[in-house]
Amino acid sequence: MANNKSAKKRIKVAERNRLVNKSYKSTVKTLTKKTLANCEKYKLDPNSDNKNLVMFSLSEAFSLIDKAVKKNVLHKNNGANKKSKINKLVKNFLTSK
């Protein structure tokens, strides 16, 4: 257990940061799943509305990943890998008929 004031403060700050980071990571996972669900929807009914929905959710996911990297929640390589993986899956869905 921490004995001095600065150590106690660091514990509080670390816990606060952990919760914020957890929130970012959870939201990234949610938006990734949402994007893939929209891809499935597009695959079943390929029309321009569904394609726009896929592109919008993809841009939302990319934006949040970039923000997480900027705030050091994710490492830049990890963020790039996540974006690449999502983009590869979306590209496969959009090109396969």
From Swiss-Prot:
* GO molecular function annotations of the record: small ribosomal subunit rRNA binding; structural constituent of ribosome
Which Gene Ontology CC terms are recorded?
Answer: small ribosomal subunit
Keywords, in A-Z order: Ribonucleoprotein, Ribosomal protein, RNA-binding, rRNA-binding
Please name the Pfam families in this protein's record.
Answer: Ribosomal_S20p
**Can you supply a Gene Ontology BP term from the record?**
translation
Recorded hits in InterPro entries, A to Z, give: Ribosomal_bS20 (IPR002583), Ribosomal_bS20_sf (IPR036510)
Record's HAMAP family? Ribosomal_bS20
* Task of the protein: Binds directly to 16S ribosomal RNA.
In the record, the note on similarity to other proteins reads:
Belongs to the bacterial ribosomal protein bS20 family.
Q: What is this protein called?
A: Small ribosomal subunit protein bS20
